[in-house]
Amino acid sequence: MKLVLVVLAFIALVSSVSCTQTGGCSCGQQQSHEQQHHPQQHHPQKQQHQPPPQHHQQQQHQQQQVHMQPQKHQQQQEVHVQQQQQQPQHQQQQQQQQHQQQHQCEGQQQHHQQSQGHVQQHEQSHEQHQGQSHEQQHQQQFQGHDKQQQPQQPQQYQQGQEKSQQQQCHCQEQQQTTRCSYNYYSSSSNLKNCHEFLRQQCSPLVMPFLQSRLIQPSSCQVLQQQCCHDLRQIEPQYIHQAIYNMVQSIIQEEQQQQPCELCGSQQATQSAVAILTAAQYLPSMCGLYHSYYQNNPCSSNDISGVCN
């Protein structure tokens, strides 16, 4: 916009100068023409009309000055335009330099950050290595301490195991004695019919065959039915204990009835064996179990010392 305004001003000045020149020329021509037509009349005024050439010279000088001034102004404008053109170039150069400096700074910052990251990684790896080495040393020391204590531990452990085994055996013996004792199963008195069946020396092996052949039931058959009924009322895991306690009660009663001279004799032993042998077939006679010694912890006891 500045350039356009300057050009318009310059054109206006040129047009004004041209107009003044044309006006001056017309005036001069008119004066000369009048002088030619009126040479005599206006002759005395020639001296008076001499100054106009000076005026014409002044006008020419002014016109030259006016013409020079626009030229100077135009030159100044061109210089100003060149300066304005140079300024954007200078600004562009400055911007490029700033941009390059920013890139250099960013590159330096990235390099610095990368170097810091490498240093941190190196420090972390070094710390981890130190921690691992410390843990390994601690483990080695702990293992050495364990190795020193290992020779003493097996002896103590073996002694503790032996004590625990002895305690377990003692507890098992106590449990077995309580199980096989007479008072362990409180419902042994419910087997009165089985008790009477064995006292009358009824054979449980023979009874199944006699049931099909005898027309009238004998006392042993009646006791058999009642004994089986009593056994079915007892829980299965307590049947053998109840039978064993019943046999012990029978043997004690016989010992009380017999004189003490026969205690420990062969006759008493045989009677006890016969009772036990008959008692072991009571479950099979009733269809409960096949053998008295099956799952019976008390059947392995020695009956040689029953008469003490």
UniProtKB/Swiss-Prot annotation:
Classification via CDD domains: AAI_SS
InterPro entries to which the protein is assigned, alphabetical: Bifun_inhib/LTP/seed_sf, Bifunc_inhib/LTP/seed_store, Glia_glutenin
Main localization category: membrane
Membrane topology of this protein: Lipid-anchor; GPI-anchor
Comp. bias (Low complexity): 55-119, 130-159
Subcellular location: Cell membrane
Top-level taxon: Eukaryota
Propeptide: 287-308
Start and end residues of each stretch annotated as Disordered: 27-159
Cited Pfam families: Gliadin
Entry function: Zeins are major seed storage proteins.
Protein name: 50 kDa gamma-zein
Species: Zea mays (Maize)
